Swiss-Prot record:
Entry protein name: Adenine phosphoribosyltransferase
Main location class: cytoplasm
Catalytic function, reaction form: AMP + diphosphate = 5-phospho-alpha-D-ribose 1-diphosphate + adenine
HAMAP family assigned: Aden_phosphoribosyltr
Alphabetical keyword list: Cytoplasm, Glycosyltransferase, Purine salvage, Transferase
Amino acid sequence: MDLRQLIRDIPDYPKEGILFFDITPLLGDPDGFRRAIDLLAERFADSGATKIVAAEARGFIFGAALAYKMGLGFVPVRKPGKLPYKTVSVSYDLEYGSDTLCMHEDALLRDEKVLVIDDLLATGGTLSGVIDLVEHFGADIVGIGVVIELEFLNGKEQLRSYGCESILQIA
């Protein structure tokens, strides 16, 4: 099954000059969605992970489904003000500015084995922020998995030491 056929290209969204890769056709196709989760599960079957950490919003979709498939806990990473309990936060740089991500202060244990999942790897900014949060807890990142990697943006370079895996590469 060619998962690329289930990703819709939308030019000039959310602003002019940006090519947006829409995953909703993949999510709407039961076989395609199942295949994406199965491929991620195969890649990380021997990772030793105990938790999956994923950032909102689209990372939740794949992270939660993969956690269910692998029998692991799921930890959401959200923007400030979106989690009800006490949080730990980290600010990180984006291509044009910065942003902040938060996790509950009791979400991870020291030395816990964590798999970080997201829908798309572009420049690596968001994933770097998630990594900083996970490492704040003293947890160990045993892998990073993404559905789509935009190879032309070289985001994988800054994640090299964590073993980033993608199931679909767009050059």
